[in-house]
From Swiss-Prot:
GO terms for biological process: cellular response to histamine; chemical synaptic transmission; chloride transmembrane transport; cochlea development; gamma-aminobutyric acid signaling pathway; inhibitory synapse assembly; inner ear receptor cell development; innervation. GO terms for cellular component: chloride channel complex; cytoplasmic vesicle membrane; dendritic spine; extracellular exosome; GABA-A receptor complex; GABA-ergic synapse; plasma membrane; postsynaptic membrane. It is found in: Postsynaptic cell membrane; Cell membrane; Cytoplasmic vesicle membrane. Heteropentamer, formed by a combination of alpha (GABRA1-6), beta (GABRB1-3), gamma (GABRG1-3), delta (GABRD), epsilon (GABRE), rho (GABRR1-3), pi (GABRP) and theta (GABRQ) chains, each subunit exhibiting distinct physiological and pharmacological properties. Interacts with UBQLN1. May interact with KIF21B. Identified in a complex of 720 kDa composed of LHFPL4, NLGN2, GABRA1, GABRB2, GABRG2 and GABRB3. Glycans are attached at N32, N104, N173. It comes from Homo sapiens (Human). This is Gamma-aminobutyric acid receptor subunit beta-2. Belongs to the ligand-gated ion channel (TC 1.A.9) family. Gamma-aminobutyric acid receptor (TC 1.A.9.5) subfamily. GABRB2 sub-subfamily. 4-aminobutanoate binds at Y181, T226. One of its GO terms (molecular function) is chloride channel activity.
Length: 512
């Protein structure tokens, strides 16, 4: 009994296989090729490709499948990506149903020109083409119930609007929009054939700069002025790989910034070395910025990598300005400070000499139309014996209020008491004539006194020359270098600490 039931089950399950084998053999049999030809001719005879299936009835449902072969390129400059795929559409056309042959008929690609096909197009397409090697890559397959499978091998360049504010730590969403060009939702409907399994090959894609994190399928309807149209969307979520940019941009920028700090350890008086190092690092950062801008579109907002490169550029530029500050203190502010101190001391000495000079009486004498002011001893007790008198004069000119206008020059003059008595007693003796430039000592015209006048003038000239030498030495006197060294020492700590803080804030903000 059990054997009989077993044989019965075997007969039930094997009957369809036998029928299919017989039909297949009949189809492949050259004697039955005429039957296949007659079936195809009958289907195409009287077929009107101008009318959609079920014209005037319910909308035809078109299911779609995509098998992605590769994503060839993602361009930030052109804001697009290139995709190669096997695009398949399936719909049912009752006019193409048959029951004579219980098998699918795969026909030549040229038959597609004689059948109705959906007017599908890619909404965000920039440039597309159907491959034609060795023949046009199209497929038409008919099923007995009238289902038509239409396949194409297409390469399309689709627009992908990117937000590059976080570049190169960004994630982008690139979509492929599929829509009917002429038929509205009253005539045609689109759906993903196989639901979530409608798109395959995504996990096999490998991109040099991106990783496909996720993808999703979207079905929606869009409304235009001409009606409502069906639309299918395939959205890729792309995450940029940071490894290339770390090696190409970030690491060189970090190393160049650190290199600019080497100038803090170079001696402050080595101007050529520090300036050359600073300018070289600044120009290198400028070159990196320029190269980066050439590989990106001209967008109005600031990108993440722009923030980093600008930060590095600021640090490099500030290192150069640090030496400018050191150089200013070393060669500029120090001598100026010393000069001001010297002028202040000279002013104090002038004020002191002004008070001392007020103790000397002046006597105005007019001789030969010229007015002189004579110095004389108010005591008049100069003894005839030889004595040494030291006078501290000021090499000065005086205004009507007797204010001292020039710096102090100490003049020590040793003369005989007899000459001093003669000079102070005679109103025509040694006198000072004031003009706008200097002091002139004049004698009373006696030949015997000309030697003393010339000696005094020579002494004054020597003092003037000595004062000029002291003034020239003041300009090259090396100032106190404590502040200069302190700036370099603080810079060695300040720059690395601030740059490290900048990196921590940058990476925490943009990575998260």
């Amino acid at each position: 009994m059990w054997r009989v039931r077993k044989r019965g089950y075997f007969g039930i399950w094997s009957f369809p296989l036998i029928i299919a084998a017989v039909c297949a053999q009949s189809v492949n049999d050259p004697s039955n090729m005429s039957l296949v030809k007659e079936t195809v001719d009958r289907l195409l005879k009287g077929y009107d490709i101008r009318l959609r299936p079920d014209f005037g009835g319910p909308p035809v449902a078109v299911g779609m499948n995509i098998d992605i072969a590769s994503i060839d390129m993602v361009s930030e400059v052109n804001m697009d990506y290139t995709l190669t795929m096997y695009f398949q559409q399936a719909w049912r056309d009752k006019r193409l149903s048959y029951n004579v042959i219980p098998l699918n008929l795969t026909l030549d690609n040229r038959v597609a020109d004689q059948l109705w096909v959906p007017d599908t197009y890619f909404l965000n397409d920039k440039k597309s083409f159907v491959h034609g090697v060795t023949v046009k890559n199209r497929m038409i397959r008919l099923h007995p119930d009238g289902t038509v499978l239409y396949g194409l091998r297409i390469t399309t360049t689709a627009a992908c609007m990117m937000d590059l504010r976080r570049y190169p730590l960004d994630e982008q969403n690139c979509t492929l929009e599929i829509e009917s060009y002429g038929y509205t939702t009253d005539d045609i409907e689109f759906y993903w054939r196989g639901d979530d399994n409608a798109v395959t090959g995504v996990t096999k894609i490998e991109l040099p700069q991106f990783s496909i994190v996720d993808y999703k399928l979207i079905t929606k309807k869009v409304v235009f002025s001409t009606g409502s149209y069906p639309r299918l969307s395939l959205s890729f979520k792309l995450k940029r790989n940071i490894g290339y940019f770390i090696l190409q941009t970030y690491m060189p920028s970090i190393l160049i910034t650190i290199l600019s700090w080497v100038s803090f350890w170079i001696n402050y008086d080595a101007s050529a070395a520090r300036v050359a190092l600073g300018i070289t690092t600044v120009l290198t950062m400028t070159t990196i910025n320029t190269h980066l801008r050439e590989t990106l579109p001209k967008i109005p907002y600031v990108k993440a990598i722009d923030m980093y490169l600008m930060g590095c550029f600021v640090f490099v530029f500030m290192a150069l300005l640090e030496y400018a500050l050191v150089n200013y203190i070393f060669f500029g502010r120090g001598p100026q400070r010393q000069k001001k101190a010297a002028e202040k001391a000279a002013s104090a000495n002038n004020e002191k000499m002004r008070l001392d000079v007020n103790k000397i009486f002046y006597k105005d004498i007019k001789q030969n139309g010229t007015q002189y002011r004579s110095l004389w001893d108010p005591t008049g007790n100069l003894s005839p014996t030889r004595r040494t008198t030291n006078y501290d004069f000021s090499l000065y000119t005086m205004d009507p209020h007797e204010n001292i206008l020039l710096s102090t020059l100490e003049i020590k003059n040793e003369m005989a008491t007899s000459e001093a008595v003669m000079g102070l007693g005679d109103p025509r003796s040694t006198m000072l004539a004031y003009d706008a430039s200097s002091i002139q000592y004049r004698k009373a015209g006696l030949p015997r006194h000309s030697f003393g006048r010339n000696a005094l003038e020579r002494h004054v000239a020597q003092k003037k020359s000595r004062l000029r030498r002291r003034a020239s030495q003041l300009k090259i006197t090396i100032p106190d270098l404590t502040d200069v060294n302190a700036i370099d020492r603080w810079s060695r700590i300040f720059f690395p600490v601030v740059f490290s803080f900048f990196n921590i804030v940058y990476w925490l903000y943009y990575v998260n």
